[in-house]
């Protein structure tokens, strides 16, 4: 099979192409009163966040990675006027709660913008002061202090979550929180209309119309045969089963097993990749709380049963044994965040110490602030490339969260 624009058969194969989103004006539309609704704990300083992100991108380029930007691809995908019009309609249709019937005024604003300006504006949000329409609804006469007709999308620089590259296909995800649900509309248009992707017959394992929630931070490609997916606050068991069935029924897919790993439903354990990432053939970073749960975990191995022509599910309580079995590795090493210390581990977990981006076997990108975890990784033979993330981390995501691999070399 000839390689297309998407190929990800592992977490550790040499990274060749990655999708990023440079932080933009959406971060400056964060205000204290509405942080919770937009899933932020704090407000990053945009200028510094952009410098940190630019350095992250440059580090990847220096390691031979082609860096693509979501915002640029999205703008290039709506060159056709009809596609642009459909894109605007789709965005507004998913924003009815806030636009209060002012579609035409917002469209008039959009009509003054270039394709890139349009994409940037949709990402950053539309403030009410930008259009000042005549009041036509009773609700508009009320003392509503909410400042936006179109909400900002400050989480977009975490490109891992709205989509996930799996094999030669992709999931276009239905996000759990309303604040993030519109994010996957960009990759939908990119895959369907961008010249780089539109004629590649890319399998869509799940699309954003799927009724079940799934997010890319819970989707890990351990090998060409095995996926690991977190059952979390943001990813449902129903979505995992649907994904497994779609992959198993595709004759071009190589995956034979899907390992569903239940994790606690809290912000500290937002996604599987915030507590667990693969960094070498036999090494994983791991939050100590997961290590302590060993022997009492809910792990489910989903396979296709050729005899019964249906999926079969086996249960396990030991993550180490399960991974060694499905990956065919004798002795997997778990490397604890913050060396498992009750203080260092908790602090560095909060700052995404487990959320490493592997760019080839045994080489990872991490935040420099997680120095205890980074030193331990080096002791275990891992090459650690550190980046500054004092502002980026305020969104509660690390290098893996901020990147969506589109192409990795096979291992």
Curated annotation (Swiss-Prot):
Known pathway: Amino-acid degradation; L-arginine degradation via ADI pathway; carbamoyl phosphate from L-arginine: step 1/2
Keyword Hydrolase among record annotations: yes
EC number(s) recorded for this UniProt protein: 3.5.3.6
Gene Ontology cellular component terms for the protein in this record: cytoplasm
Keywords (A to Z) from UniProt: Arginine metabolism, Cytoplasm, Hydrolase
MF terms (GO), sorted A to Z: arginine deiminase activity
Keyword Hydrolase assigned: yes
Known catalytic reactions: L-arginine + H2O = L-citrulline + NH4(+)
Source superkingdom: Bacteria
Coiled coil, from the record: none
Positions of the catalytic residues: 401
HAMAP family for the chain: Arg_deiminase
Family under the similarity heading: Belongs to the arginine deiminase family.
Entry protein name: Arginine deiminase
Annotated gene: arcA
């Amino acid at each position: 099979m000839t390689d297309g624009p998407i190929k990800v058969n592992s977490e550790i194969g040499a990274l060749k192409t990655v999708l990023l989103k440079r932080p933009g004006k959406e971060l400056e539309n964060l205000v204290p009163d509405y942080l919770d609704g937009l899933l932020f704990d704090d407000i990053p300083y945009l200028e510094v966040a952009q410098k940190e992100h630019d350095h992250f991108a440059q580090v990847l380029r220096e390691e031979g990675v082609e860096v693509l930007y979501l915002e640029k691809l999205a703008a290039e995908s709506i060159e056709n006027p009809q596609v642009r019009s459909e894109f605007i309609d789709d965005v507004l249709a998913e924003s009815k709660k806030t636009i209060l019937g002012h579609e035409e005024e917002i469209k008039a604003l959009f009509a003054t913008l270039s394709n890139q300006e349009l994409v940037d504006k949709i990402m950053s949000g539309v403030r009410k002061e930008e259009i000042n329409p005549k009041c036509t609804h009773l609700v508009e006469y009320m003392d509503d202090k909410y400042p936006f007709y179109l909400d900002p999308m400050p989480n977009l620089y975490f490109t891992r979550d709205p989509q996930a590259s799996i094999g030669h296909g992709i999931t276009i995800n239905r996000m759990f929180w309303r604040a993030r649900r519109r994010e996957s509309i960009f990759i939908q248009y990119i895959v369907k209309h961008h010249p780089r992707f539109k004629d590649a017959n890319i399998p869509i394992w799940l699309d954003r119309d799927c009724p079940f929630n799934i997010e890319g931070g819970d989707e890990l490609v351990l090998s060409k045969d095995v996926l690991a997916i977190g059952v979390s606050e943001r990813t449902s068991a129903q979505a995992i089963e649907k994904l497994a069935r779609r992959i198993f029924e595709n004759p071009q897919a190589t995956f034979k097993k899907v390992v569903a790993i239940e994790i606690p439903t809290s912000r500290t354990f937002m996604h599987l990749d915030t507590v667990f990432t693969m960094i070498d053939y036999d090494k994983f970073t791991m939050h100590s709380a997961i290590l302590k749960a060993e022997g009492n975990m809910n792990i489910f191995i989903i396979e296709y049963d050729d005899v019964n022509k249906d999926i079969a599910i086996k249960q396990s309580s030991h993550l180490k044994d399960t991974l060694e079995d499905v990956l065919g590795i004798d002795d997997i090493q778990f490397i604890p965040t913050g060396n498992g210390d009750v203080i260092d581990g908790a602090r560095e977990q909060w700052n995404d110490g487990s959320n490493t981006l592997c760019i080839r076997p045994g080489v990872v990108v991490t935040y420099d602030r997680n120095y205890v975890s980074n030193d331990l990784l080096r002791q275990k033979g891992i090459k650690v490339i550190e980046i500054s993330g004092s502002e980026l981390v305020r969104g509660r995501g690390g290098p893996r969260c901020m990147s969506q691999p589109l192409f990795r070399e096979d291992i």
